Amino acid sequence: MATLLRSKLTNVATSVSNKSQAKVSGMFARMGFQAATDEEAVGFAHCDDLDFEHRQGLQMDILKSEGEPCGDEGAEAPVEGDIHYQRGGAPLPPSGSKDQAVGAGGEFGGHDKPKITAWEAGWNVTNAIQGMFVLGLPYAILHGGYLGLFLIIFAAVVCCYTGKILIACLYEENEDGEVVRVRDSYVAIANACCAPRFPTLGGRVVNVAQIIELVMTCILYVVVSGNLMYNSFPGLPVSQKSWSIIATAVLLPCAFLKNLKAVSKFSLLCTLAHFVINILVIAYCLSRARDWAWEKVKFYIDVKKFPISIGIIVFSYTSQIFLPSLEGNMQQPSEFHCMMNWTHIAACVLKGLFALVAYLTWADETKEVITDNLPGSIRAVVNLFLVAKALLSYPLPFFAAVEVLEKSLFQEGSRAFFPACYGGDGRLKSWGLTLRCALVVFTLLMAIYVPHFALLMGLTGSLTGAGLCFLLPSLFHLRLLWRKLLWHQVFFDVAIFVIGGICSVSGFVHSLEGLIEAYRTNAED
């Protein structure tokens, strides 16, 4: 009797478990995620075993056919889709293809372009996240206090994590259990997430966001160059707009850039200039340590202006749009995680110290660009280094923006909107060079008409920075790797998506209000 009762209870429990699994699987299937039950997993494993045996037989047939005389022209050639099998049904491109996934250089690189070391990749990432935008961090502390300092650390941790999971989305396990690179860019990841219903929608959204982010970064470099030169030499009869024009004239040779190798050399010089700037500013602040205003660092926040600070902090860490290209161009991609760790740790420490020390020195008088607070003699020297850093930082986002535009609009193929920018010999066509120069001039025009550094940085960070660094990587990670994620990884991804969405909306609204208010003030003056 006890055995019969135990058997019935076991059957009921099994039935309830199967029904609950079916409901959960159906719910996630409707959301677009791939959840597999135990029975489905067994089925997948069985299919993989059968497929492995089938491909082993094909390989034996191919070896036998290679050993036979070449005169047997009547033999049927093996089907390409059988040889180049890939989970998901998509065949791998033939070797030498421009779009080959494994080992591809990504959006901003290619097969025939020189590879970079982990150190060179690190200089590029450091240049992106430890760039000119550190000058706005003391302004973020002004409106955020200790919470602003916490956000500098929190943003470093989150951006390092999302950078790693974004690269993880480039890889999948093949039928033999080997991890291979099946995608080559941020756009390819987005397209894979939207397939099969909207196979190109995700790529277009990411392309637009990337172009906005990169072009706005270039604009900010021109804005800060004009601002710094104008404040360094106020006695000269040269306006800020005129200084911006001079800076743009120096940047025109960027139109001739061809690969990331040259950009990496600029990034190295730029990083060295940045360390000199940090040392000079921090040394001056330490000389006034006895006057530091610790009581001015608040535990409360300015509700209206703090969202702008969030955008500034987030934008200062944006590097995700470069990462697929950098990882694809690395000589040793296995060193990518280590490179991300030390670059973000260094950036977090330097940014936190710089922002706190600078704010303690000037407190409520802290300006949008912190070097404007320096006395005239020191300001001129520091600003010259900063201008050099801005001009050396410009090539990386400009080169990336050009590559995105060329790949999405001008690449040869049936889906290209315009003819290719390169000739058959690989040389840049004259009209392609003209378009590159036009992009440089466009950044100048925007810098002249929107010369508000901190507000523009907060707006861009809230609009595209949060999307590309927080929202999309976590969403793509859930969508593509759902079946392999542990519960804490799912929790992190969902939390990052929710927090990033809230910060993005609030920061965008308040930055836009700040720009409108700034224009009204200028109009009244």
UniProtKB/Swiss-Prot annotation:
It is found in: Cytoplasmic vesicle membrane; Presynapse. It comes from Mus musculus (Mouse). GO terms for biological process: beta-alanine transport; gamma-aminobutyric acid import; glycine transport; hippocampus development; neurotransmitter loading into synaptic vesicle. This is Vesicular inhibitory amino acid transporter. Residues 154-204, 287-305, 363-383, 460-461, 511-525 are lumenal, vesicle. Keywords: Cell projection, Cytoplasmic vesicle, Membrane, Neurotransmitter transport, Nitration, Synapse, Transmembrane, Transmembrane helix, Transport. It is a multi-pass membrane protein. GO terms for cellular component: cell surface; cell tip; cone cell pedicle; dendrite; dendrite terminus; GABA-ergic synapse; inhibitory synapse; neuron projection. PANTHER family: AMINO ACID TRANSPORTER, VESICULAR INHIBITORY AMINO ACID TRANSPORTER. It catalyses: 4-aminobutanoate(out) + n H(+)(in) = 4-aminobutanoate(in) + n H(+)(out); glycine(out) + n H(+)(in) = glycine(in) + n H(+)(out); beta-alanine(out) + n H(+)(in) = beta-alanine(in) + n H(+)(out). Chloride ions activate 4-aminobutanoate/H(+) transport. Brain and retina. Localized in horizontal cell tips at both rod and cone terminals. One of its GO terms (molecular function) is gamma-aminobutyric acid:proton antiporter activity. InterPro entries: AA_transpt_TM. Belongs to the amino acid/polyamine transporter 2 family. Disruption phenotype: Deficient mice exhibit embryonic lethality and a cleft palate and omphalocele. The chain crosses the membrane at residues 133-153, 205-225, 266-286, 306-326, 342-362, 384-404, 439-459, 462-482, 490-510. Changing residue 263 to M: In a disruption phenotype model increases presynaptic release probability leading to more severe synaptic depression during high-frequency stimulation. Changing residue 269 to P: In a disruption phenotype model increases presynaptic release probability leading to more severe synaptic depression during high-frequency stimulation. The modification 3'-nitrotyrosine is found at residue 186. Antiporter that exchanges vesicular protons for cytosolic 4-aminobutanoate or to a lesser extend glycine, thus allowing their secretion from nerve terminals. The transport is equally dependent on the chemical and electrical components of the proton gradient. May also transport beta-alanine. Acidification of GABAergic synaptic vesicles is a prerequisite for 4-aminobutanoate uptake. Residues 1-132, 226-265, 327-341, 405-438, 483-489 are cytoplasmic.
